[in-house]
Every structure is written in structure tokens, then in C-alpha cells.
């Protein structure tokens, strides 16, 4: 694969309709199969869901980080669905036993976060080891996923990919690096006004912070500290990005509408633009 082909594929995806991102991505992979692995790991697409039959058909979120072949690992039962053959399972990625305990704690904790902040939706957390040694509370990575749908086909997907590594400056300090992508789709129809408004796109930001943890404490306490630190970071990131979407991007969208409207209907268009912006913000706040 050449860098030029990969860059061209990413540039093309940025210019195409974001509502057909998955279809466009599949078409590019079909045209250039050698780009498949890099595109799948680099392009964030709206999250899909599966049901865990081993845990009362509880829903979980699917992404490239819990995928093996065409199956996705559930964070609830640690099982792949659709089920893999015994031979395939031998090579399938699973977190180590200690890291799996942290994964369970993280899923339970972020499920509470989801209920409080999203008032619905689905959350999933997946972790993986960064080295082959037994996990003892040090270096690991993972992803925290949230999805909230509305009955009007609007949806919010947030993907937080993170790494937790020992800080080079102190053995009791950890470096948390989080890359967050928000995928937003707002679809509003007013039947009384015979109008339809749709807004789609994604926004990515990165943050990094060093936080001290007392490594002399029991492993369960260290796990709780990691989850609390990640929760605090993700809460701050999501709040900042929501505000950024409302106060910057939607304002810019309204300005573009204003600049392109017909001068002959300036007054009515301005009112329509204000209504459209208010409708977009209400749609975002409901997710």
C-alpha cells in the first residue's frame, strides 16, 4: 500500500456524504483490498450493536477493537458472536485474566455513567494488554463506547480510545492519552411546515494527562483509581466537545446559511436559519 493511495482514500471519505460512510468505506475496500486494514483502523464509523445470548440478550456495541474475523466480543460474557470455531478461538484476542477484571469493573462503572448522562443508550468498554507480561495495574489500552439513538433517526456515537502507561518521570504516575471521536447525525422533519433538516459529521480531539496512583495499594483499589481517572477525563472531554458543537460548529453552519441566502428573502430566510439552528441544538441536547 502506498501512502498516496491511503491519503487519497481518506481525503475522498472526508468529501463524501457522511450518512453513507460505511457504504463508501466498503466500496473503497472492494476497489483496493490492500487498504482494508489501515482504513478499518483509521476511519471511525457509526457503532453497530449485537445481542449477547449468554447474558439475557443484553446489547453491546461493536467496533474494530472487539472484532475478530466477522465476530464481535461481548464485554458482558467475554464471548464472540456469531460464535467462532474452536480453531479460530485459539488465536482470538482476549484480555488477560487480571485485565478482564478491570474490564468488568469499567463496564459496570461506565454503564452507570451512561445512565446518568445519556438517560438511555448503550455503552461498552474493551481493554487489551500492551505487553506480554502479566498485567499488574500498569500499561494497558482500551476503548470506551457510547451510543444514543432517538426515534427520529438522530443518533450520537462517541468513541474514546485510550492508552494508560507508566509516566517516565515517576513510577507512581500514569500518563492517560485519550483520542475522542464524536459521530453525530441529526435528522429533523416538521410535518406542519413540510420541512426536513439533516446534519451529519464527526469531530475528533485528543487529550493527555499525568495522574499519580499509589501503587502500594491492593490491585482492586488501583483498578478503581484507573476507572475513576478515565471517567473524569472522558466526562470533561465530552462536555467540551458538546459545547464546541453547539457554540462553534452550529453557529458556523448558521452563518453559511445566512451568507448564501437570497437577498430578496433575507428577512424570512434569517428567521428560518435561526429556527434551524435552534432545532439542531435541541436535537443535540436530546442525545
UniProtKB/Swiss-Prot annotation:
Q: Which PROSITE patterns match?
A: F_ACTIN_CAPPING_BETA
| Cellular compartments per GO CC | actin cortical patch; actin cytoskeleton; cellular bud neck contractile ring; cellular bud tip; F-actin capping protein complex; incipient cellular bud site; mating projection tip; plasma membrane
Q: Where in the cell is it found?
A: Cytoplasm, Cytoskeleton, Actin patch; Bud; Bud tip; Cytoplasm, Cytoskeleton
Question: GO biological process annotations for this chain's record?
Answer: actin cytoskeleton organization; barbed-end actin filament capping; cell morphogenesis; filamentous growth
Using the record's annotations, give every residue carrying the modification N-acetylserine: 2
Q: Which PANTHER family match?
A: F-ACTIN-CAPPING PROTEIN SUBUNIT BETA, F-ACTIN-CAPPING PROTEIN SUBUNIT BETA ISOFORMS 1 AND 2
Name of the featured protein: F-actin-capping protein subunit beta
> To which species is this protein native?
Saccharomyces cerevisiae (strain ATCC 204508 / S288c) (Baker's yeast)
